[in-house]
A protein has these predicted regions:
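Short, solvent-exposed loop/turn segments enriched in Ser/Thr/Gly
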Residues: 57-64, 136-138
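The feature marks short-to-medium sequence segments in extracytoplasmic or secretory-pathway proteins
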Residues: 78-116
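Short, surface-exposed ligand- or partner-binding patches at beta-edge/loop junctions that are enriched
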Residues: 129-158
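Low-complexity, acidic Ser/Thr/Pro/Gly-rich terminal tails and inter-domain linkers that flank the onset
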Residues: 34-57
Length: 191
């Protein structure tokens, strides 16, 4: 009986420890009450930048973009940014957008990204090449950081000249008309 009571007590303590760890671990998973300790990032404290362009043998072109915290305080981002591409006349280009993840963009769920002042979050914008021909090129990209209502505007033209963000011939169902957007990530790894 003493041995059984000790075993039960150890099991109960272990469950309490696991429950406590679970609240810490959930901070990097889904938004929870733990996220209230770090406020959401405001667009006014973020800047949009870009990293490398990648071209895969599969015909996909992708660009890594960055969101940098220029504020004085630590903040967090969680989820997918809103993205739209515009032509040289300022018109939105009629791409189809997906945030669901496909063969080019990871299907792993979003994770909380905590940004100290000066730190960056990363996201990927990917598009299949134009096989039939080119119609118009993107000049600017507009990004709504996750859970914000103000946009950041960046230059998309450098990626067009190297094969990137073109609207394709072939109509709206052409594979080259689909733009894929990853969730924000803390590192550049697989997005």
């Amino acid at each position: 009986m003493g041995r059984r009571t000790t075993s039960l007590a150890v099991t109960q303590r272990l469950l309490v420890v696991i429950a406590c760890l679970g609240t810490i671990i959930s901070f990097t998973g889904t938004p929870s009450e733990a996220s209230t300790a770090t406020p959401a990032c405001s667009t006014t404290n973020l800047s949009l930048g870009h990293g490398d362009k990648r071209s895969q043998a599969t015909g996909e072109d992708s660009v890594t973009f960055t969101l940098t915290n220029h504020g004085k305080f630590t903040c967090h981002l969680y989820g997918h940014p809103g993205v739209s591409l515009y032509d040289n006349k300022g018109r939105v280009m009629p791409f189809r957008y997906t945030w669901a993840g496909t063969m080019y963009v990871s299907q792993t769920p979003p994770k909380m990204v905590v940004l100290r002042p000066g730190a960056r979050a990363y996201f990927l914008v990917a598009k299949y090449r134009c096989d039939i021909g080119l119609v118009m090129k993107a000049k600017t990209i507009r990004v709504y950081p996750p859970n914000t209502t103000q946009q950041l505007v960046g230059n998309a033209a450098p990626f067009v000249d190297s094969g990137g963000f073109w609207y394709c011939k072939g109509g709206p169902k052409d594979p080259g008309q689909l733009v894929e957007v990853s969730p924000v990530r803390a590192t550049i790894g697989y997005m």
